[in-house]
Amino acid sequence: MRRVRKTVILTKNVPRLHPCAAAIFVVLVCASAAAVSSDDRNLAETPPMGWNSYDSYGTTINEAQVKANARWLADHLKRFGWRFVVVDMEWYVTNPTPSGNSRNSHYAMDAFGRYTPALNRFPSAANEAGFKPLAAYVHSLGLKFGIHILRGIPKEAVEKDLPIADSDYHASQAADRSDTCPWNPDNYGIAANTPAGHAYYLSIARLYAAWGVDFIKIDCIASHPYKGDEIAMISRALNQSRRSTLMSLSPGAAPLDKLDELRGHAQMWRISDDIWDLWHSEKSYPQGVGDQFSLAAVWAPLTARGHWPDLDMLPIGRLGPSPGWGPPRQTRLTNDEQRTLMTLWSISRSPLMIGGNLTEMDEWTTSLLTNREILAVDQHATDSRQVLDDGRTVIWLAQTSDGDGEYLAVFNRAENIQVIERNWKDLGLEGNSYRLRDAWEHKNLGRARSLKIQLPGHGCVLYRVSSK
């Protein structure tokens, strides 16, 4: 059945290029990309920290809600290092549904086949302003602004064969009609390494740069399926836009054998499918917190300044009014599981993106997000590695940033209370005794000649250990 579509068309005049000139231009774009750092480590010297709308608003987020969450982030979390405000998927749909990915969506789009913010949700985008006013508002709070996009080109743009901005190409020349995202019907893929495809990605990169976008989450590109050609094309386009823009790839699990490609183009990439507020899942979607240990163990040693494997968002706090999965609710993770989530993400140095509704933040969740000792592990630890996993107990070590000790994280994967005992040497620590500080409780615990701790089911501790 043909899908019903409604398009908002904006028109304006743009310069046209002769076909030969356009082809030469695109070749120059590709050749000069190497001269513009595609892995600008200054974009993400430490794992990015911020808020993403999907876990609480799904595909329904509007301008007032973005601003309210941004204000709360600026007032309460910015001083702890939280910086990004990211508008997740389908901000261009004028009739969003809580379930998302509707096959009867109406899209806002400009005359060049580029999605624009839905005016009934983002009124400041009127008069062809796009996200520029909202980005300026977020910037005025001392924060950075991000958006979600789906790889490819809108099907409607291809059906109408709209022109591609600043070129003599049209949408039909850029599209690969045989390639669609298996779980989102909005777009066709881009025909790999074609001048028209490069021209389209360059056109949207320049649009986002003009809006003031600092962070782009690109979906249906890192796994099921992995689209290396499109990753490279988008990376080149962002470089040519002349605005430093952080590139985040979703969903996971990104393939380990593509590590060099991922590092060459992106600042962060997902290493699992979506994480939600459960401990374990028998299904591939969604994943639970307890399912992340093995993935974190593989990827954490491969982190590098500017390039961060991503364990996905933090589904904590209030998930609503329209979460991307399930009914509106307070997170179903226990307090112990939430600490385990924050501890594993931090010691493996994953990006930290809050999923909860900041405008309904409670004291407990705020305490998780403002613990400077925990956040310091995520932002500044080195040599993070898992040293033990016996199926019930997981133990990690990481070096402190000052080189004066180690961080020691101990996790109980079992459902019941467990007493965990280990000699220091069994964990790769050569000293006879160590001074312990509990990072969650901010308490010095004195010296210990071995590790002995009782943990609740799915609980953890994070110590700073020093031989001095």
Regions found by a protein language model. Name each.
Residues A174-D179, A191-N193, A199, S203, ...:
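Glycan-recognition surfaces
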Residues L143-V158, S223, N239-L256:
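Aromatic-lined carbohydrate-recognition surfaces of secreted/lumenal glycan-active proteins
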Residues T340-L388:
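Catalytic cores of secreted or luminal carbohydrate-active enzymes
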Residues R339, W345-S348, M353-G355, D389-E430:
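Carbohydrate-binding surface patches
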Residues G446-K468:
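C-terminal beta-strand-rich structural cap/linker in extracellular carbohydrate-active enzymes
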Residues A74-A209, V213-C220:
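Aromatic-lined carbohydrate-binding/catalytic grooves of carbohydrate-active enzymes
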Residues P48-S53, R83-D88, V93, K144-I149, ...:
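Structural recognition of the beta-strand scaffold that forms the well-ordered cores
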